[in-house]
């Protein structure tokens, strides 16, 4: 496989993510997968909540109408495109609902994805009827300022490298880091041609 660096990283991620997700599909614990809400549903519920709040204010009817117009303007800015609330994994543990995004690593072209994650995470955090927690599981320990931005946002909880495998073990009961260490030796498992290609790049 003559892969350039970013393409190879993506192929690794395509193998790594479903490998990790198997632990959540067949857990040794009591976690359960769930279907995430649709953005239109979240928007409708929040709009009704705000509308009811405005209706209860002791202000003139014309002022209530104006407030609702301003509120609609804000939604117009946010919803210029369809927002997908679906991430890579959604599961419950007790009363908590976890939203998980898997990343092989954070490279130089993650700005758009970072902005999307900040928006999606913020929406989940503002759904007060549910106790959502947003997690990012990163395979690599070498990442850049985009991941730091997500970490500093307070919206996403980040785990990298061995820390990711520890969280997976805590949630599912599987120690896949130990399994990887015991069963995979990439450089010796690859064909000589593949090994030379990796060392060359």
Where in the sequence are the language-model features?
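Conserved catalytic cores of phosphodiester-cleaving nucleases, focusing on short active-site segments
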Residues: 24, 87-105
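Hydrophobic beta-strand segments of well-ordered beta-sheets in folded domains
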Residues: 96-99, 130-138
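Active-site-adjacent loop/helix micro-motif of nuclease/hydrolase catalytic cores
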Residues: 106-116, 145-146
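Short, charged, amphipathic alpha-helix that recurs within catalytic cores of restriction-modification
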Residues: 113-126
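Domain-level recognition of nuclease-like catalytic cores that cleave nucleotide substrates
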Residues: 135-201
């Amino acid at each position: 496989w003559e892969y350039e660096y970013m393409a190879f990283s993506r192929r690794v991620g395509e193998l790594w993510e479903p490998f990790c997700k198997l632990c959540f599909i067949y857990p040794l614990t009591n976690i359960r997968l769930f279907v995430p809400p649709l953005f239109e549903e979240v928007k409708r519920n929040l709009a009704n909540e705000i509308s009811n709040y405005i209706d209860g204010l002791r202000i003139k009817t014309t002022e209530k109408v104006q407030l609702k117009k301003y509120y609609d303007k804000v939604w117009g800015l946010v919803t210029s495109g369809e927002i997908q609330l679906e991430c890579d994994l959604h599961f419950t543990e007790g009363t908590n609902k976890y939203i998980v995004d898997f990343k092989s690593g954070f490279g130089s072209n993650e700005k758009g994805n970072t902005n999307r994650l900040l928006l999606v995470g913020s929406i989940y955090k503002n759904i007060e009827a549910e106790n959502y927690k947003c997690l990012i599981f990163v395979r690599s320990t070498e990442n850049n300022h985009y991941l730091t931005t997500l970490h500093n946002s307070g919206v996403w909880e980040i785990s990298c490298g061995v820390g990711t495998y520890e969280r997976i073990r805590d949630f599912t009961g599987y120690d896949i880091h130990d399994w990887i260490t015991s069963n995979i030796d990439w450089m010796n498992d690859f064909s000589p041609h593949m090994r030379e290609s990796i060392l060359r790049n």
